[in-house]
Amino acid sequence: HVFLHEFGHAFAGLADEYYSSQVAYSDFYPKGIEPQEPNITALLNPKTLKWRQYLSKGIDIPTDWGKEKREALSAEIRTIYKEMKQKLDSLEKAGASKDEISEVKKSYNQKIADKREELNQVIQKYRYLEGKVGAFEGAGYSSTGLYRPSMDCLMKSNKGMKFCKVCQKAIERMIIYYTK
């Protein structure tokens, strides 16, 4: 999958669509300027969206995909994990019993499971958007201000394990260019 992702960059000039990973550069795309890559946009003018010919019918631009709620729940889960680790480290240093440690783990794991279930409900709510083309905020290393064409694509993560329609078309254009 990494090879295919990197192939997308090298062969078709595709941008990274992820935004939550730590990268060595910030503000890679200047605000207010439309990126050149075919698969991300600053959405300066929704009426001239660069992939408008591929938009799915009935999809709002920008496309609500539960981003804020997903991010908030994911952050809560990370916080609970961090709190659990700190608590368990503290208990171990204090010489707590295995039973006490086990009970604390059980309590934190239940909190995590509850938050994951909440997150899963949000994911399910927006599942109808899978495979659709819209303008999904969060792309090009930026959580806000840049948009990608689909909820998931090989340029965003390895979950979808395929390129979205916009990226497929960009690759197709390059194949046609090099074979003519």
Model feature map: region roles:
Residues H1-E17:
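Active-site recognition of the HExxH zinc-binding catalytic motif
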